[in-house]
Swiss-Prot record:
Record carries keyword RNA-binding: yes
UniProt function note: One of the primary rRNA binding proteins, it binds directly to 16S rRNA central domain where it helps coordinate assembly of the platform of the 30S subunit.
Species this chain originates from: Chelativorans sp. (strain BNC1)
Signal peptide residues on this chain, from the entry's feature table: none
Name of this chain's protein: Small ribosomal subunit protein uS8
Alphabetized InterPro entries for the sequence: Ribosomal_uS8, Ribosomal_uS8_CS, Ribosomal_uS8_sf
Family: Belongs to the universal ribosomal protein uS8 family.
A single Gene Ontology CC term: ribonucleoprotein complex
Subunit record text: Part of the 30S ribosomal subunit. Contacts proteins S5 and S12.
PANTHER family, alphabetized: 40S RIBOSOMAL PROTEIN S15A
Pfam families, alphabetized: Ribosomal_S8
GO biological process, one term: translation
């Protein structure tokens, strides 16, 4: 089956796995998905992820979800910029997610990064998703 929004598909898989209290979830691999997972890992929203390569040339990302005292660390995860409606933000208009308790993930000319890192580097970009 063809997926029109691979990043949105990954976020939905994570949201569904958290709803079912799963410890791991897998998704087809791509560089953008891996970069977003790098940011999520650095910010403490997931434990880790590994890339699993198969004999047929395809690979998947195995994501280990993080829970704190039985409650998921990720309370809310949402796609902002979608294929039908891209959302771009300048460095001055990068939002503070949940009054600074959450993060916004942006795709910038300097790579995929969290909102606070984009402010430090004084760069804007595509507002991919927000996590709280």
């Amino acid at each position: 089956m063809s997926v029109n929004d691979p990043l949105g598909d990954m976020l939905t898989r994570i949201r569904n796995a958290i709803g079912r209290k799963k410890t791991t979830v897998s998704t087809p691999a791509s560089r953008l998905r891996a970069r977003v997972l790098d940011v999520m890992k650095a910010e403490g929203y997931i434990r880790d992820y590994t890339q699993v390569d198969y004999d047929n040339g395809k690979s998947e990302l195995e994501i280990q979800l993080k829970y704190l005292e039985g409650a998921p660390v990720i309370r809310e995860i949402a796609r902002v910029s979608k294929p039908g409606r891209r959302v771009y933000v300048s460095v001055k208009s990068i939002p503070h997610v949940a009054n600074g308790l959450g993060i916004a993930i942006l795709s910038t000319p300097k790579g995929v990064m969290a909102d606070h890192e984009a402010r430090e580097k004084n760069v804007g970009g595509e507002f991919l998703c927000q996590i709280f």
